């Protein structure tokens, strides 16, 4: 089976600082993989490399078997890789619909805007009700929904969700993970990157533990629960 997204022996650097040391990770079609680790382990760097935001210094990245190493982020997006970045990635002074339109037009042109808007409002009805509201005045949870909707140009092959629960109330986190579950039933593969891991473990098929830029453990979710909770959950 060809992986929908695969990193092989990836190293990544920020200037003189090396963040990843030979990371290998694959996500198969329809699979959910959780990437967990402590703060500073390199999780967000993996996400950046996997979506084209950061070119690896060595190693390779493939999407559906096609070599995408060093390609620009828009090429990853057109290949079906969606990346919901950590935090609230919105244009704070623009309306909700303007945020979405800018993102959708960049990837698929004018023709792709209307169906993408319809899908965004179907996934997140609250955004449809607030389409004319300035994004910076939305609640934290609504801004996170907007940042996730911005990458949902269509049903992606793989969605990279980076720290989806960060700073949000539990009820909002539940709503966001319900959306991830729905996307998965529609065929989207998931790379879920979390420091607070309970939701990710419940959804994942496999779990990778990242430690100081290395994958220190990789296995089935059922086998990972005890070791992950011991390592990363508060006592």
Predicted regions and their residues:
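ABC-type ATPase nucleotide-binding domains, specifically the catalytic core motifs of the NBD
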Residues: 15, 71-73, 96-115, 123-128, ...
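The feature captures the beta-strand-to-loop junction immediately N-terminal to the Walker
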Residues: 36-38
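Helix-to-loop junction immediately C-terminal to a conserved catalytic motif
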Residues: 51
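ABC ATPase NBD coupling module
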Residues: 55, 67-87, 110-117, 129-132, ...
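Conserved ABC ATPase signature
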Residues: 134-138
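ABC ATPase C-loop
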Residues: 151-152
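Catalytic Walker B motif of ABC-type/P-loop ATPase nucleotide-binding domains
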Residues: 159-163
